[in-house]
Amino acid sequence: MVAKPDAFRYDTNGDDMKDNILIEKTIDFGARIVKLNRYLLETRQEAVLSKQILQSGTSIGANVNEAQYGNSKADFIAKLHIALKETAETEYWLRVLEKSDYLDENMASSMLSDCLEIKRILISSINTAKDGQK
C-alpha cells in the first residue's frame, strides 16, 4: 500500500550525520520526495513530473552531503549553491503539482514548507561561509 502524501515523514534514527541539521533535514526531505514519487507513480499514474521532482528533490541532500567533503571553501560554497538551485527547482515542481491538482493544498503546503526551510538554511550557510572567506 502506498503511503498517503500527508504522511511523507521520515524519522532518522541517529547516525554520524545527526549533528549537522542541514544534512538531517535534507535526508528527511529526500525521503519525503521518494515517497511522493511513489505516490505519484502508483496512485496518480504520473511519470513525467514525478521523475523531475525526484531528481531535483533528492539532489539537494546529495549536494549538501558532498559539500562536506569539498577540497576547499570555494568548493564547499559551490556545492551549496548547486543544492540551492535544486531547492528552487523542487519548489517549482511542487507548485506545478499543486496547480495541476496532483497534490492538494495541504500536501503541497507541507512539502513546500520543508523545502523553503531548507532554502533558508542553505542561504544562511552560504552567506556564513562567504563571510568566513573574507
Name each model feature, range by range.
Residues 1-62, 66, 70-134:
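Short, C-terminally biased terminal segments at protein or domain edges
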